[in-house]
Design a protein with these regions (language model features):
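Conserved alpha-helix/loop element of class I SAM-dependent methyltransferases that forms part
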Residues: 19, 27-52
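Conserved SAM-binding loop of SAM-dependent methyltransferases across substrates and taxa
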Residues: 61-74
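Conserved SAM/SAH-binding beta-strand->alpha-helix loop
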Residues: 83
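Conserved SAM-binding strand-loop segment of SAM-dependent methyltransferases
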Residues: 98-109
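A short acidic, Gly/Pro-enriched loop at the edge of an enzyme's catalytic core
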Residues: 114-121
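A short glycine-rich, Lys/Arg-flanked "PGG" loop and its adjoining helix->strand segment in the class I
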Residues: 137-149
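Conserved class I S-adenosyl-L-methionine
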Residues: 155-183, 195-205
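Long, charge-rich, low-complexity alpha-helical segments
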Residues: 267-310, 343-517
């Protein structure tokens, strides 16, 4: 039974999310497919996605798990959340989508229903740092007791040392609101963020704080109000050092394996630093990552977690085994500059082999290709027996310069595009709701749209398998004449060009995100 203080705290959190809910989005780094791919890279096989059991703790309206449920009809997906408002609306959306493999439950994680059984993938995103220690331990209890033997979980949380800078911003916003309250101002959730923004804008403009802190403060002002409210004004915001987080995990028979954002576990740093840290930390991967966090001022982590008993089965190392790399699927699209070089992060790629890899990936896009297949194609083209394709593929993955998947993805090309019926109701939700509470997302989580262009939605719904692009062009031209669709033209372009361009964009969007497979 939770103590009295925790119960009061839970009520405050519940009211906060009932009164000011987040828009519910899909987060790529939390998805079961991402968890599976990263662990496959480290030699650990997790359960098949197609019939997996998935749990999300703190699911909001379900926006993070609905796309997975849509794509995997044989999977069973459950979300729990404190906010009854969000759960009720989320279940209404699910019912309208006609989904029978997903349900949302209004439940406190401390009262988790043991009858829900084991899960292959557990997601807890944007929760852990915003609850007290008793609830944190309750979350870890659920993961320990309900994660299947070879399952994996995702936990995201704010981390030190990076968050120490941001605490200055949180403190000044809370200080200003408290000061104004004491002077008789009516401060509540509807205006707290507005006053808070004023405080950090003042700080950003006139403070003698160092540029790193100022940069972080300026970044806050660009965020949505609902994000600032829950990130900086919640009763709880408890960042942790990674080593502290892992200590809590070990107390529950769990371990931090790796960050879902691989760059945080395997950063691109000098050999000198790497050698010093290896000498200092040996095989202690958490200690090494903690040093990385100190060096690089990390403020947020997305830990992939599993049972401590699985540690010996996982190659937790920057040196990925070729046998584990061979079956990883990659895809990417790259453009050359006017001088004929690929440019990545403002750097011209002049290495011949890397350029050849980018050529092959771009030619194959939007289909995926295994690293093994990629290596063979490079060998065929450069006529050299030896190459560094595997090392370069790892570099691209660590640097987030290529999409990586555990399963092959093949785009379906059709003269008459047909949206898969399972996505029809999903698209219709965004057509009929001017203020959707979930974001439109691909099932991989690589795409999130808060708002979709109405013209694009109109085009996508015409992809029913009976119409060519030319047919759709003529239909839209007629709709524009009748005033049913408004086409906005930039100077120098015609409405016909705009329509054709939008049709091409929509076709690419549907195919690249596999909405027609």
């Amino acid at each position: 039974m939770a103590n009295k203080e925790t119960l009061e705290n839970v009520k405050i959190v519940q009211k906060s999310y009932d009164d000011a809910p987040y828009k519910s989005k899909t987060f790529y780094y939390t998805q079961p497919g991402r968890q599976q791919m990263v662990l496959k890279l480290l030699g650990f096989k997790t359960p098949d996605l197609k019939n997996a059991r998935v749990l999300e703790i703190g699911c909001s309206f379900g926006g993070n798990i609905i796309p997975f449920a849509l794509e995997n009809p044989k999977a069973e997906v459950i979300g729990i959340d404190l906010s009854s408002v969000q759960i009720e609306e989320g279940n209404r959306i699910i019912e309208n989508l006609g989904l029978e493999n997903i349900r949302l439950i209004h439940q406190n994680v401390l009262d988790f229903d043991e009858k829900l059984g084991k899960f292959d993938y557990i997601i807890c995103h944007g929760v852990f740092s915003w609850v007290n220690e008793e609830v944190q331990r309750g979350i870890l209890d659920v993961i320990k007791n309900h994660l299947s033997e070879n399952g994996s979980a995702i936990l995201s949380y704010n981390t030190y040392p990076g968050w120490k800078n941001l605490e200055v911003a949180r403190d000044v916003m809370l200080f200003r609101d408290e000061m104004l309250k004491n002077r008789g101002e009516q401060i509540n959730e509807s205006n707290a963020v507005t006053y808070g923004r004023g405080a950090i804008e003042f700080l950003s403009q006139f403070s003698i704080l160092n540029e790193k802190i100022k940069e972080g403060i300026t970044g806050i002002t660009e965020k949505d109000d609902y994000y600032i409210l829950h990130e900086y004004f919640e009763e709880n915001n408890k960042p942790l050092y990674l080593y502290e987080f892992n200590k809590m995990l070990l107390e529950h028979g769990l371990i931090h394996v790796v960050d879902s954002d691989l760059m945080k576990t395997f950063p691109n740093i000098s050999n000198e630093i790497e050698e010093k840290l290896t000498a200092e930390c040996g095989n202690d991967n958490v200690a090494k990552e903690q040093y990385y966090d100190f060096l690089l001022d990390r403020q947020f982590r997305i830990s992939i977690v599993t049972h401590e008993a699985n540690k010996e089965k996982i190659n937790i190392s920057k040196d990925i085994r070729i046998t584990d790399l061979k079956e990883i699927e990659l895809r990417g699209k790259y453009e050359k500059n006017k001088d004929g070089f690929y440019t990545i992060e403002n750097n011209e790629i002049k290495d011949e082999e890397v350029s050849l890899i980018l050529d092959i990936l771009s030619e194959n896009y939007p289909n995926t290709i295994t690293i093994d297949e990629l290596e063979k194609k490079v060998r065929e083209r450069n006529k050299l027996e030896n190459n560094t394709v595997y090392a370069n593929a790892v570099y691209l993955m660590y640097g987030k310069l290529v999409e990586a998947y555990s399963n092959k993805l093949t785009v379906k090309k059709e003269e008459k595009v047909k949206i898969n019926p399972k996505y029809k109701n999903y698209l219709n939700y965004f057509i009929t709701n001017s203020n959707p509470v979930i974001a439109f997302a691909s099932y991989q989580g690589t795409v999130n749209y808060d708002v979709i262009n109405p013209v694009m939605l109109s085009i996508i719904t015409l992809f029913d398998g009976t119409k060519t692009d030319e047919d759709i062009f003529n239909i839209l031209l007629e709709k524009e004449k009748e005033g049913e669709v408004v086409i906005s033209c930039e100077e120098g372009s015609s409405k016909e060009e705009v329509i054709r361009n939008n049709i091409e964009i929509c076709r690419n969007f549907v195919e690249i995100n596999f909405l027609n497979k």
